[in-house]
């Protein structure tokens, strides 16, 4: 288990795109049987994020590190007054240590500071530990559908957290 010596930093450093993309590809394949499509989707989104960050558009990334190794990440993009939570992942050895909660709190705090209307996220039903974190943070599942984007059949979920009226 990861202890308090983990740090969370905001911003993109060389190697972060590759590390976050790799974590998604390896962990989702190992834990849920997803194929290369999830990794390709994360890579595409991370490149778009980097472009948005450098052009001054609304985007942010937090990375959890321990001993120089990336053990978690979460991102936010802003689209029309709505924050979209992206790339939330925590390495198995860092789970149940508070890292996930700290990452999620950082991302939601960013959206609140920007006075955004709500935070939206898309996930898959097999990620029950993540769903627990979302519920504790005040998110509600607003829809679900069966999809085949990442594998033969998965339940895809949309969650929202309303930040103001």
Where are the regions a protein language model picked out?
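C-terminal "cap" of GNAT-fold acetyltransferases
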Residues: 2, 13-16, 117-165
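Acetyl-CoA-dependent GNAT
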Residues: 6, 10-93, 101-110, 114, ...
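Flexible nucleotide-binding loop
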Residues: 97
């Amino acid at each position: 288990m990861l202890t308090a010596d983990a740090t969370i930093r905001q911003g993109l450093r060389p190697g972060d795109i590759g590390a976050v993309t790799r974590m998604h590809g390896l962990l989702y394949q190992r834990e849920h049987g997803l194929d290369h499509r999830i990794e390709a989707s994360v890579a595409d989104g991370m490149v778009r994020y980097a472009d948005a960050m450098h052009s001054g558009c609304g985007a942010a990334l937090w990375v959890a590190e321990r001993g120089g190794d990336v053990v978690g990440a979460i991102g936010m993009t802003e689209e029309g007054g709505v924050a979209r939570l992206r790339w939330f992942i925590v390495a198995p050895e860092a789970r149940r240590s508070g890292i996930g909660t700290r990452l999620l709190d950082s991302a939601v705090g960013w959206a609140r500071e920007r006075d955004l209307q709500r935070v939206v996220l898309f996930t898959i039903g097999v990620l029950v530990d993540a769903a627990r974190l979302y519920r504790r943070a005040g998110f509600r599942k607003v829809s679900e559908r069966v999809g085949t984007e990442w594998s033969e059949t998965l339940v895809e979920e949309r969650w929202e957290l309303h930040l103001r009226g």
